[in-house]
Amino acid sequence: MTSPATFGLSKSERLYLRDEINTVFGEGKAFVVYPLRVVYRLGSEHRAAYSSMLVSVAKKRFRRAVKRNRVKRLVREAYRLNKHLLNDVLQERQIYATIAFMVVSDELPDFRTVERAMQKSLIRIAGNVPSSALKNE
């Protein structure tokens, strides 16, 4: 278990650069754990944080900004509390991950549903981390 100081979500853990976002969506692998669609990319290039993430909620699904922001807040909170499930594996194997979470539900999910989906998705990504650094990236 990590120390309580690592339960924050710093700027280095947020995915915000256009080039990195395009790389994740262009070269990443995707799967769905309802209500989340997860796109991730593993690489050996050095970063400030072992995993960085972004959250996207479509305006088509939630018309009101208040609801979109609430869903994004729920996903960020679930990630913040459960990121140790993935970061421990990434740190041990010296691999870096960029992850995009997109909400595919049309209804406002509760925190318990989002947290279960987040745990399943982080465990699934951790299971796909190779045992040694990637050669071609």
Swiss-Prot record:
Protein's recorded name: Ribonuclease P protein component
GO BP: tRNA 5'-leader removal
EC number: 3.1.26.5
Source species, domain of life: Bacteria
PANTHER family tied to this protein: RIBONUCLEASE P PROTEIN COMPONENT
One GO cellular component, as annotated: ribonuclease P complex
Species name: Porphyromonas gingivalis (strain ATCC 33277 / DSM 20709 / CIP 103683 / JCM 12257 / NCTC 11834 / 2561)
GO molecular function, one term: ribonuclease P activity
Assembly behavior: Consists of a catalytic RNA component (M1 or rnpB) and a protein subunit.
General function of this protein: RNaseP catalyzes the removal of the 5'-leader sequence from pre-tRNA to produce the mature 5'-terminus. It can also cleave other RNA substrates such as 4.5S RNA. The protein component plays an auxiliary but essential role in vivo by binding to the 5'-leader sequence and broadening the substrate specificity of the ribozyme.
Family membership noted in the UniProt record: Belongs to the RnpA family.
Disulfide bond annotation, renumbered to this chain: none
Enzyme class: hydrolase
Keywords in alphabetical order: Endonuclease, Hydrolase, Nuclease, RNA-binding, tRNA processing
Reaction catalysis annotation: Endonucleolytic cleavage of RNA, removing 5'-extranucleotides from tRNA precursor
InterPro entries: Ribosomal_Su5_D2-typ_SF, Ribsml_uS5_D2-typ_fold_subgr, RNase_P, RNase_P_CS
